[in-house]
């Protein structure tokens, strides 16, 4: 455990270093810390011995080590902080016409990446928590059809498929009837369970040959189990990490798994400093924040960047964008649930 003065010194070094990326000397600290230069140097030496500071090769100053940044995050960083100077810029950036949910999530991801220079990832509500509230099959031709699904009464999912060779029109009708009777109004996690247990037994009552029918069920509903992921600023990762991080960001489903694992049960926000279980994220910092998607649940807003990022401003931007996005989504869903009319 460090003393209060040592804590103040560490906090100030973190603040100055993240702004200038230059080693910090005792003279710069003396302007804020009410102690002699010798006392400050002594405390800096103790912080270095504890592994919280590192000596610069080109000067007598010190800079935070990864452990120092982690200590700062765990003991001094407020995860709910907001810098009012950024509010106007975020609100202005959100001033656009959105025609669907994905437009807003993609825009929010781009705004965060552009304002930080890092990499932003946004996840929709966790697939398992979504509910199938609508289902239809539209035959496009003699050989293909379109499954049209609605999640949470608002999110459309479409899957085009080739009609099995032995299918007749009545078979498509039976397929739709089974979905409506057994899967409609179920959560996605329950649908996953029923496809393995209940549906194979039900299909036997309607179809003589069941293999291609069960494959069709798997194909149509596999889309529901995938995360909806929006990544922005992927190229930025090359400025603060190596190629492995850049390549990892291409695997959106694995990215989603890693980010969800960064939050403990019941947590609304977290900051990991070189602490991810994912090897490609082991040498970067990951800020993760839940934001409300009205009527549906929580999405995830994440920022991936260097260990020496400006944590106060990054946390502030994540919080502001999360709040503005939630407000915009609230307006969007209220509009969807209202009576539509045209104003002349």
From Swiss-Prot:
Keyword terms of this UniProt record: Repressor, Stress response, Transcription, Transcription regulation
GO molecular function: DNA binding
Matching InterPro entries: GAF-like_dom_sf, HrcA, HrcA_C, WH-like_DNA-bd_sf, WH_DNA-bd_sf, WHTH_HrcA_DNA-bd, WHTH_transcript_rep_HrcA_IDD
Gene Ontology biological-process entries: negative regulation of DNA-templated transcription
Coiled coil: none
Recorded superkingdom: Bacteria
Xref: Pfam families: HrcA, HrcA_DNA-bdg
Family annotation (NCBIfam families): hrcA
Family listed: Belongs to the HrcA family.
Role summary: Negative regulator of class I heat shock genes (grpE-dnaK-dnaJ and groELS operons). Prevents heat-shock induction of these operons.
Protein's name according to its UniProt entry: Heat-inducible transcription repressor HrcA
Gene that produces this protein: hrcA
């Amino acid at each position: 455990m460090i003393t209060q003065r040592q804590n103040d010194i560490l906090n100030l070094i973190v603040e100055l270093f993240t702004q200038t990326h230059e080693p910090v000397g005792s003279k710069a600290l003396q302007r804020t810390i009410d102690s002699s230069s010798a006392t400050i140097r002594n405390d800096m030496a103790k912080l270095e011995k504890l592994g919280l500071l590192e000596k610069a090769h080109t000067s007598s100053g010190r800079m935070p080590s990864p452990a120092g940044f982690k200590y700062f995050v765990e003991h001094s960083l407020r995860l709910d902080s907001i810098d009012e100077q950024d509010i106007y810029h975020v609100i202005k950036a959100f001033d656009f016409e959105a025609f669907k949910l994905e437009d807003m999530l993609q825009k929010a991801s781009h705004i965060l990446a552009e304002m930080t220079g890092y990499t932003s990832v946004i996840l929709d509500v966790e697939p398992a928590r979504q509910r199938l509230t609508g289902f239809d099959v539209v035959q496009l031709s003699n050989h293909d059809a379109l499954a049209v699904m609605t999640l949470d009464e608002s999110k459309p999912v479409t899957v085009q498929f080739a009609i099995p060779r032995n299918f007749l029109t009545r078979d498509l009708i039976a397929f739709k009837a089974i979905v409506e009777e057994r899967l409609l109004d179920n959560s996605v996690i329950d649908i996953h369970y029923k496809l393995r247990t209940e549906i194979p037994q039900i299909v036997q009552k309607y179809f003589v040959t069941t293999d291609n029918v069960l494959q069709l069920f798997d194909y149509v509903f596999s889309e529901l189990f995938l995360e909806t992921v929006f990544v922005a600023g992927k190229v930025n990762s090359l400025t603060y990490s190596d190629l492995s991080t850049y390549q990892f960001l291409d695997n959106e489903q694995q990215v989603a798994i890693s980010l969800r694992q960064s939050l403990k049960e019941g947590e609304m926000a977290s900051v990991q400093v070189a602490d991810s279980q994912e090897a490609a994220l082991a040498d970067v910092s990951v800020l993760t924040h839940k934001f409300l998607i009205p009527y549906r649940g929580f999405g995830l807003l994440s920022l991936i960047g260097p260990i020496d990022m400006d944590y106060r401003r990054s946390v502030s931007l994540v919080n502001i964008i999360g709040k503005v996005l939630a407000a915009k989504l609230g307006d969007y869903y209220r509009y969807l649930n209202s009576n539509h009319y045209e104003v002349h």
